[in-house]
Amino acid sequence: MTAPETPAAQHAEPAIAVERIRTALLGYRIMAWTTGLWLIALCYEIVVRYVVKVDNPPTWIGVVHGWVYFTYLLLTLNLAVKVRWPLGKTAGVLLAGTIPLLGIVVEHFQTKEIKARFGL
């Protein structure tokens, strides 16, 4: 027969879960801002290339933005799993990273909601 868990062991599990949520939230917040800023840089590159018609505009901005957005997707999915977002909300937050500045606005409201929900 197993011994009942001590009160300290019962409270250790939620503390670990909250720390994992805090870590996932920090990664999401950093990547939401980074993705938003690189998306603005990508818009700048598109304007320079197709509107201003500058010879040899920077092409590396699109590559960097693609990798930054991929990292944003991974970290957002990590957070979504930890806080148990429904599929529709997860898709909405993921797609918010494709519109300039919307990802940053969504990050603000999601952070506020998660901090209130988990007492961070």
UniProtKB/Swiss-Prot annotation:
GO CC aspect terms: plasma membrane
Membrane topology: Multi-pass membrane protein
Disulfide bonds: none
Pfam family membership, one: DUF3817
Parts of the chain that traverse the membrane: 24-44, 61-81, 86-106
Domain of life: Bacteria
Protein keywords: Acetylation, Cell membrane, Membrane, Transmembrane, Transmembrane helix
Location(s), subcellular: Cell membrane
N-acetylthreonine modifications at: 2
Chief location of this protein within or outside the cell: membrane
InterPro entries: DUF3817_TM (IPR023845)
Family label: To M.leprae ML1176.
Annotated protein name in UniProt: Uncharacterized protein Rv1342c
Organism: Mycobacterium tuberculosis (strain ATCC 25618 / H37Rv)
